[in-house]
From Swiss-Prot:
Family label: Belongs to the ATG2 family.
Subcellular location: Preautophagosomal structure membrane; Endoplasmic reticulum membrane
Protein name as annotated: Autophagy-related protein 2
Phylogenetic lineage: Eukaryota, Fungi, Dikarya, Ascomycota, Saccharomycotina
Membrane topology: Peripheral membrane protein
Gene, per the UniProt record: SPO72
Chief location: membrane
């Protein structure tokens, strides 16, 4: 026992020295102490001195004050108790980069007071000064504890007290021992401790109710009670249930007044604290020694110094004391953390061992925690950057001065003492023993109340119960979480969102988990040594260290129980916002960590980087879970269950694997399994290579090609790979799930921002902070990271390493998600439809910088029903995914703060359209209405949405196709889109879709059975050409080439097409806008506008017929029932005789005879007579009057369509494209030949038995062979006609091929004349339809179906739609080779220029429903046509009739519902006609065809005026022609005969001259009546007469001269001259049409070797022909599918598809295939027995190689008229005449030279005379021809000079 005789002065000095040695307080000396008893000292309102506290690690003391401090000695000096009440400390973080910081932290205040007894008694001044540091949170805890091993006295760095003397006493040794014992039993107790942390962005306050520190036998026990952490700044959302109370106000008042009593009332929860506080307060106030003046002086000096130091610090933005911040803080700062109890036990002080921590209950409010942590991370990152720049400046200045002479000492660091200390402490007990937390609860929504409990009973809590961590030895650490669950509380009900299975029998689970641990390579103590608590834990883990020297760790986490998630809407709302908050915290932490890593890298660089010798640790982490079940409650009747099979993760392999993931759906009691199945899911965290594609930027490609994507290899830091994704669900189930998910997501999106724990509600009244929270990721990275790499490289921007690093950085993706295979099966789409199957492969998405990119290698969407498979979306060649060189779909998503752009690129995809699918769909639903409602619903902006992010979607397509499959025909067509772009943008009131397509081609085939097998091109030639043009390593086949090789015909091309679609979503807002702007246009829900630049089509008769029927069959057949078309009510019976006029037929004869058919009165008279007869009154303007008035304001049209076509050119070719058509025509001729052969054999037999006259009688009585093919080709021939003549007649009819007759005769075989038929498409077109400025407008007024929708009883009639067609200009060009005219039809330009905005043809159709209850409608049509000018050549007319009358039975469709035309009106039409007949059909004339009489007369300028006609009640459009014929026929007979007769060619001049005489009299009279000027009137009449008469006389002269020239040319040609061929561009010849005959002899002739000279000539001929064809054809190259030739020779239309460069090089000229030659050689020898007739016919359509034409005559040019290129003036006439004379004289000279050479070669006089007689006519006639031509040219010039108006017509009539 310690004796009680120690003097009071010594006790007082002991306690005083304890206070002085703390070095914390301001001036404290003996006079300042108040002595209460022998062993008590009480201080009140003592301020801490920041300077004496010194440097603290990581922070600075800004202010400190203690309300009361009581020091008590126990039993003399056997122990010291320190009681502190109401301690308040203010600190600020300091991130000073100091090299000695770690050394300062190593020392404690215990070392400075190690030998207090020596200091007190002996006053030793030896020792070294040391910096003293203290932990700010427990500054009074560790200062006075003494380690037994510390014996060296360390005097404090402080001035000596006045009480301390320099004398030594005899009691020194005894007192030293006594003081050591007393200080070793030090006991500290702190009540109501407040620590305030202030920084630039964040202020925190920690409140501790009590802290007690006791030492017992070397074991320190720290007990902490009631810890609260509050957020003072920023002003954050405290959470739900927070109520502002008076407790925080008391707290602030107590801190201001520094009253320990108030602080005790507020913060104390322990009973013993009350006694201590009461005792301390009473002792201090009743003290006899302590004076109040001294106390006030002590307090004032402390606070004044504290404020001075704080103010002098000068750190901007930091808070120095509470008084300055009190006004800015909330009255009730939210509590973010509460811990009720924490006990810490450990041994030792300088070396801590046997650490045990036991925590009671922890409650954490996550709502205020999120913005607090984000603000802390931002502030720390900002401060570190500032300190970094400061340290950098110091380092630069220091490096310039230090150790310049001894650089080896630059980076000295003494690490030997640390190694020795570590080796000395290795034998001690372990540092850590146990850590336990009873419960740790995180509330996602609730706030914390003052008592530490959650304020709101409702919400979601994340609970960790009984967390244990134990250390078995220095190498093994293990533990677990006994219970982990997530619970939602709502209205006193508890719902488990997440929980593990409850523990069952131990033997069932223990073996499997122990096995997994053995595989992991960890200790078996996880299951054996942890005890019963951890063996049943939900989460277990082990941390194993392989050896003491190694830093490698093996961490194993095992969740052996099955986990269950149960989510509903409210749970997902809270947890989703919770996840967003965690993500934001993680992002900010990542930015802070990046800053710290940058600083560490800089420090290593500045320190020399000598620490690289240590090997990087290779830790291993293993995670193993059981099956996870996730349930989503979408609605009351719909639940989704996600089953995740066990998860395995190995950090060393850097891979997480899941064998399978299933998604099931539960609807009531029905469960559908396998809705979605994911197989073999892998998460790879190491760098993984994958294949990516980038758009090539090659600019060397031609205009018609597009650069292909470039394949590259990239690396990804994080990869998710799914081997197979499969889904199988019915359409009804999919609709059900989709509808429920849609409602769920809409409600989720609507309610998510309003949640209290959302990021939007984290900050209160601080929009700046919220903005920084959302954009801090980009802001912080831009402040530091973006500027550093340039400096670290030490290279300029132009140096190569920078460029290289930049390129390497591009190839590293942040993450990658890949699906190797994906399959979707949707069953029961419609009852009759079948199933949908979607198959995709190699789906990859990855993030590159801030963009998300992806691709889908192959896509296939199919409809399956039974054995039927129909493709909807597929690759056009149907290649396997392994054969594809680039993806079919590419996706790029650009993420931005204001705009998100999604770019989708499609290549080589085909979208198929099947008409029969419309029949398979549900008829009860209106497709148009459903689509309309869906679109409006999708694009209608949400009123609750406040997001400013704009979404733009762009589609791009290259070489994509749209397949058109009719419903009842076997033909098929494809639209090939070369390039297309589509932009989708969302507006406030409207939603826009803008599309642009280029190079749209159309291909067609008559029957899908005729599709040929595709042959791959040769790799050598194709690859070389491909690499040269595209620079790609693989061969790419253009879709147009592909389909052409399959047998499709290229029909047309559209240059550019623009499509714009506008969806009006807010009609009321648009109405208001239109009213303000004065816009009167009607509004529509959908507005479609299409603009086509240039359209070109090449058609034959059969392809045109197929195309028209294909378009008709692309829609559903329109059929109405009788009850839908008419209403018949038999309720009251029907009186048949009611309403019948008995005298209806009485005056019929008189009425017809009184009809006046003259002029324009015809229509009105006929109408009135019919009205009188039928007693029906027609109101013509009934529907016109109410056209739009009913709908202008109240009604909104569903759809408006506007189509504008700038130019449309339709080339009509002769011949036929389809093989079946050609075979049918040849078959008819073949049948005739067969019948003729049989007839000839019969005749020969008859001749032997019968006399001659009987045979002649039989021949006379023979009938005629006739057959009509395709309703356009009429084959008529007598039975005795030669078959060869019949074939020639058909050729003349189809091709006008006269000169080819001789060649056909030479190559024809007996009985094989049908093979001489020329039936293929001509290389040149015959007619050209040139249409310009076509406008089509469609206004849909109603889509209502009376069968489904209700009908308004007050509606008298209903407008359905209005269609208007306008054609600005119509020109039909005549290109028939035998025709000399230019335009077949055009506007009558002689009338002058048209008015701007007028159209040549205008057609308007108004569809109405007279009875709104009926489905069928009626049409009201109005047609107006401008005056027309016609130049009709009979050959062109025959071709036109034959073209449009062509009908193929294969494409006949059943008639649709008849369109009833209620009213048809056509305006008056003026016509001026020229007609040139070529032949007369006498057979038709004999059969009664009166129209053949017109072929006897040539018409020139006949005028016709067709009056205005109105027709009513026309049953169908075909009846319109009959009605017009009946209406106009009387007009021809009565009024138009004179106009027609006046146009007869011989009478034309007479009529015109007669008109001149008429003008001589009529014009003066009319002019005199106007102004009374006689002389001027006579002058005008005379001028008009002279002009007319003179022009006609000159025109007669031109005709006589031209006729003479023609006769002379024909005579010269008969005598062997060149004739009219001199005027032709080419030297005559036949039509460019080869035989369709697979002739036997011709291949043998072609197979003979030709000289190279001939080949070159041939290629030049073809090149020339190609140039001429392109002048009237496509501007780009055309390609026709004529590879499968049924003609032996090459078809000329192939020329147009051959490159000119190849033609000029003559490299394509090949003989027929060797196989074909070998096959045909036996036929040339007459060996026909081996093949049947059918085989020969099939043989005609086999493939032939291309070879050149033998001569230039095979390319026939169009005949040139003598009236072409007329001179416009007399001067031009003289020049043309001189040129004509020169040309003909040159020919005469040439002929004379030829005669001279021939005379020189003759030997006899007879030969000379023959030569002279042979050439004399030509020599004599050629000058005459030149003279007549010169005269005609001169007269033309004079005539055109006189009357220039006639020249306008001649330019239209004759080609230039």
């Amino acid at each position: 026992m310690i004796p009680q005789w120690i003097p009071q002065n010594i006790q007082k000095r002991l306690l005083l020295y304890v206070l002085q040695q703390l070095s914390l307080f301001s001036e404290i000396d003996l006079p300042n102490l108040e002595e209460v008893s022998l062993n008590n000292i009480i201080l009140k309102d003592v301020a801490l001195d920041p300077e004496k506290v010194g440097k603290l690690p990581g922070c600075n003391l800004r202010y400190g004050q203690i309300g009361s401090l009581e020091l008590t000695t126990i039993s003399g000096i056997s122990g010291v108790n320190i009681d502190v009440n109401d301690a308040e400390i203010v600190i600020s973080p300091d991130f000073d980069i100091d090299e000695n910081m770690t050394n300062q932290v190593a020392f404690s205040l215990a070392q400075s007071t190690a030998n207090l007894a020596n200091t007190i008694m002996l006053n030793t001044n030896d020792g070294s000064d040391m910096n003293e540091t203290s932990d700010p949170a427990s500054e009074d805890d560790d200062e006075d504890d003494i380690d037994d091993k510390i014996t060296k006295p360390i005097p404090p760095k402080r001035r000596t007290s006045s009480v301390t003397g320099n004398k030594t006493t005899a009691l020194g040794g005894v007192m030293q021992k006594a003081v050591e014992i007393a200080l070793s039993r030090l006991s500290i107790k702190v009540n109501s401790l407040k620590i305030k942390i202030v920084s630039d962005l964040t202020d925190l306050q920690m409140e501790v109710d009590s802290v007690s520190i006791n030492s017992t036998n070397g074991t320190r026990t720290v007990s902490i009670k009631g810890v609260k952490l509050r957020t003072l700044k920023p002003n954050v959302n405290p959470g739900e249930g927070f109520q502002s109370g008076h407790a925080p106000q008391k707290k602030q008042q107590g801190s201001d007044n520094d009253s320990p009593t108030d602080a005790n009332k507020h913060g104390s929860e322990n009973d013993n604290d009350d006694d201590d506080d009461d005792y301390g307060n009473e002792s201090l106030m009743d003290s006899m020694v302590f004076s109040h003046e001294e106390a006030s002086s002590i307090y004032m000096s402390a606070t004044s110094r504290s404020f001075e130091k704080s103010a002098a610090s000068g750190i901007p933005g930091e808070v120095d004391n509470k008084a300055t911040d009190k006004e800015d803080y909330s009255e009730d700062p939210p509590i973010i953390f509460y811990m009720d109890d924490c006990t810490i036990e450990f041994d030792g002080l300088s070396t801590i061992s046997n650490l045990e921590i036991e925590v009671g209950n922890i409650n954490l409010a996550f709502t205020p925690l999120t913005p607090t942590l984000v603000s802390i991370f931002q502030g720390v990152a900002k401060s570190l950057k500032i300190k970094y720049y400061q340290q950098k400046k110091k380092t630069k200045s220091r490096s310039a001065q230090r150790n310049e002479k001894f650089p080896q000492y630059t980076n000295d660091n003494d690490e030997i003492p640390e190694d020795q200390s570590e080796s000395d402490d290795a034998s001690h007990e372990p540092f850590f023993n146990r850590f336990k937390v009873n419960s740790f609860v995180i509330s996602a929504t609730s706030a914390l109340s003052e008592n530490g409990l959650f304020a709101n009973k409702n919400g979601i809590n994340i609970i960790f119960f009984n967390i244990n961590i134990k250390q078995k030895n220095e190498l093994l650490l293990y533990g677990g979480v006994e219970t982990f669950k997530i619970i939602r509380f709502e209205d006193d009900n508890t719902y488990e969102i997440f929980h593990f299975d409850k523990p069952q029998s131990a033997p069932s689970s223990a073996p499997s988990y122990s096995g997994s641990n053995d595989v992991a390579g960890t200790s078996s103590s996880l299951s054996s040594s942890t005890g019963s608590a951890t063996s049943k834990a939900d989460i277990r883990f082990e941390v194993f260290k392989k050896s003491e020297e190694s830093d490698d760790l093996e961490v194993t986490v095992l969740m052996a129980k099955s986990a269950h998630f149960n989510f509903d809407l409210q749970s997902l709302l809270i947890l989703s916002n919770f996840a967003k908050a965690v993500s934001s915290i993680y992002d900010e932490y990542g930015l802070l960590k990046s800053v710290i890593d940058k600083l560490d890298t800089r420090d290593k660089k500045w320190s020399g980087g000598t620490n690289n010798s240590k090997m990087s640790s290779k830790s291993e982490f293993i995670l193993q879970t059981a099956t996870i079940f996730v349930n989503f409650i979408i609605s009351d009747d719909c639940q989704l269950q996600l089953i995740v099979f066990p998860i395995k993760f190995n950090l060393r392999q850097e891979q997480l694997t899941i064998s399978k993931i299933l998604l099931n759906c539960t609807n009531g009691d029905t469960q559908v399994e396998g809705v979605i199945i994911l197989t073999d899911v892998s998460l790879i965290t190491k760098n993984q290579e994958f294949r990516a594609y980038f758009q090539s930027t090659n600019t060397t490609t031609s205009a018609n090609t597009h650069p292909l994507p470039r394949k590259t290899t990239m690396n990804s830091k994080l990869s998710v790979i799914v081997q197979k994704f499969s889904s199988n669900v019915s359409m009804d189930r999919l609709k059900f799930i989709g509808e429920k998910l849609k409602n769920f997501s809409n409600e989720f999106i609507e309610r998510s921002p309003t949640q209290s724990n959302s990021l939007e509600n984290s900050f209160l009244n601080e929009p700046v902070e919220r903005q920084r929270l959302e954009s801090s990721l980009h802001m912080n990275s831009s402040l530091f990271s973006t500027r550093r790499p340039g400096r670290r490289l030490g290279l300029g921007f132009n140096n190569s390493p920078s460029v290289f690093l930049g390129s390497t950085r591009v190839t590293m993706a942040s993450f990658q998600v890949c699906f190797k295979e994906a399959t979707f099966n949707i069953t029961g789409v419609f009852p009759k439809f079948g199933n949908f199957s979607v198959q995709m492969s190699d789906i990859s998405f990855y993030k590159l910088k801030n963009d998300i990119l992806g691709h889908i290698l192959s896509v296939s969407v199919q409809r399956k029903k039974g054995d039927l498979v129909e493709n909807l979306i597929h690759q056009y060649q149907d290649l396997s995914p392994n054969s594809l060189e680039f993806p079919l779909l590419s996706i790029k998503c650009k993420l931005g703060d204001k705009t998100t752009k999604i770019e989708i690129t499609a290549r080589n995809l085909v979208l198929e359209y099947y008409t029969n699918w419309l029949l398979l769909m549900d008829k009860e639903e209106s497709i148009i209405d459903a689509v309309e409602e869906e679109i409006i619903e999708k694009v209608t902006p949400s009123q609750h949405s406040s997001s400013q992010n704009k979404l733009d979607i762009r589609y791009s397509m290259y070489d994509c196709m749209v397949g058109l499959t009719p419903g009842r025909l076997s033909c098929k067509s494809y639209l090939i889109i070369g390039k297309g772009d589509s932009d989708i943008s969302f507006g406030v009131d409207q939603f826009y879709v803008k599309c642009s397509f280029r190079n749209i081609s159309m291909v067609l085939i008559d029957d899908t059975k005729n599709i040929l097998p595709f042959s791959e091109p040769s790799t050598s030639s194709s690859s070389s050409s491909s690499s040269a043009t595209r620079q790609t390593p693989y061969v790419y086949i253009q879709p147009l080439d592909y389909y052409s090789k399959l047998g499709y015909i290229h029909l047309g091309l559209i240059n550019v097409a623009h499509v714009g679609i506008t969806f009006n979503t807010d009609i009321e807002a648009l109405k208001d806008r239109n009213e303000k702007l004065g816009i009167k246009d009607s509004l529509t829900f959908v507005d479609l506008k299409t603009n086509l630049d240039e359209c070109q089509f090449n058609l034959c008769a059969d392809t045109a017929n197929t195309l028209i029927q294909l378009v008709n069959d692309l829609k559903l057949p329109l059929n109405f029932k009788d009850e839908d078309k008419m209403k018949v009510d038999f309720a009251d019976g029907i009186n048949v005789m009611q309403g019948i006029d008995q005298n209806i037929f009485k005056g019929l004869t008189e009425t017809l005879t009184e009809l006046n058919l003259n002029g324009t009165e015809n229509g009105s008279t006929s109408e009135s007579s019919s009205q009188e007869a039928s007693s029906l009154m027609f109101e013509e303007g009934h529907f016109d009057r109410g056209n739009r008035s009913l709908y202008d304001n109240s009604h909104v049209d569903p759809l408006h369509i506007n189509i504008n076509l700038s130019k449309v050119k339709i080339y009509l070719h002769d011949g036929y494209d389809w093989k079946d058509t050609r075979k049918a025509i040849r078959g008819a001729v073949k049948n005739f030949e067969t019948a003729q052969t049989a007839k000839t054999v019969a005749k020969e037999k008859e001749k032997k038995r019968k006399v001659e006259f009987e045979t002649r009688d039989i021949e006379v009585q023979e009938d005629v062979f006739q057959e009509t093919l395709f309703q356009s080709i009429h084959v008529v021939a007598p039975r005795n006609q030669n078959a060869r003549d019949m074939a020639t007649s058909i050729n003349l009819d189809l091709q006008n091929d006269k000169d080819g007759e001789s060649r056909d005769v030479s190559t024809a075989n007996s009985g094989k004349s049908y093979k001489n038929l020329k039936l293929r498409r001509s290389a040149k077109h015959k007619l050209l339809f040139d249409l310009k400025s076509i406008e089509v407008g469609v206004n849909v007024y109603s889509t209502r179906d009376p069968r489904r929708d209700k009908t308004d009883e007050n509606m008298k009639y209903e407008l359905l739609n209005f269609i208007e067609l306008r054609v600005g200009t119509v020109d039909i060009y005549d290109n028939v080779s035998t025709s000399t005219w230019n335009k077949f039809l055009s506007y009558m330009n002689i009338l002058g220029d048209r008015e701007i905005g007028t159209s040549m043809v205008k057609v308007s159709i108004l569809n109405v429903r007279p009875d709104p209850a009926m489905v069928s409608g009626e049409a009201i049509m109005n047609v107006s046509v401008l005056p027309l000018r016609l130049h009709i050549d009979q050959d062109a007319l025959d071709f036109l009739v034959r073209f449009f009358e062509f009908k193929d039975e294969r494409f006949e469709l059943p008639p649709d519902e008849m369109v009833y035309i209620q009213k048809f009106e056509i305006s008056s039409i003026k016509l001026k006609l020229d007609y040139k007949p070529k032949k007369v059909d006498y057979a038709g004339l004999r059969s009664g065809k009166a129209g053949e009489f017109a072929n006897f007369f040539t018409l020139d300028g006949s005028t016709l005026t067709l009056p205005k006609v109105k027709l009513f009640g026309i049953p169908g459009a075909p009846k319109i022609g009959i009605g017009l014929g009946r209406a106009w026929l009387p007009v021809f007979q009565s009024t138009q005969v004179i106009g027609i007769i006046s146009g007869v060619s011989p009478l034309r001049s007479v009529v015109n001259i007669g008109g001149g005489f008429k003008d001589l009299v009529a014009i003066p009279i009319s002019e005199y009546k106007k102004d009374g000027r006689l002389w001027r009137s006579i002058q005008k009449g005379t001028v008009s007469f002279a002009k007319t008469t003179g022009y006609e006389i000159l025109n007669l002269g031109v005709k006589l001269a031209s006729g003479t020239q023609v006769l002379l040319e024909q005579g010269e040609e008969m005598l062997g001259g060149e004739g009219s061929s001199v005027r032709s561009p080419n030297l005559g010849g036949s039509d460019n049409r080869r035989n369709s005959n697979a002739s036997d002899e011709l291949p043998v002739e072609v197979a003979k070797p030709k000289s190279q000279n001939n080949l070159l000539v041939s290629s030049q001929i073809l090149n020339k022909a190609s140039t001429k064809i392109e002048t009237h054809s496509y501007d780009t190259k055309k390609l026709y599918s004529n590879i499968e030739l049924d003609d032996e020779d090459m078809d000329d239309n192939r020329i147009n598809g051959i490159n000119k460069e190849l033609l000029s090089k003559s490299i394509f000229l090949l003989a027929p295939a060797e196989e074909k030659l070998a096959k045909l050689q036996p036929h040339t020898k007459g060996n026909h027995e081996g093949l049947t007739e059918e085989e020969e016919d099939e043989d005609e359509d086999e493939e032939y190689q291309l070879y050149a034409y033998e001569n230039e005559e095979e390319l026939q040019e169009k005949l040139v008229s003598l009236y072409s290129n007329q001179p416009e003036t007399i001067e031009q006439g003289l020049k043309s005449a001189y040129k004509s004379l020169g040309t003909n004289f040159k020919l005469t000279k040439k002929q004379l030279l030829k005669l001279r050479r021939e005379l020189a070669e003759t030997d006899t006089i007879q030969d000379s005379m023959v030569t002279v007689l042979k050439n004399s006519p030509i020599i004599l006639m050629r000058p005459l021809i030149g003279s007549t031509e010169a005269v005609s040219k001169l007269l033309m010039g004079v005539g055109n000079q006189i009357d220039g108006k006639k020249l306008v017509e001649k330019k239209d009539k004759y080609p230039t």
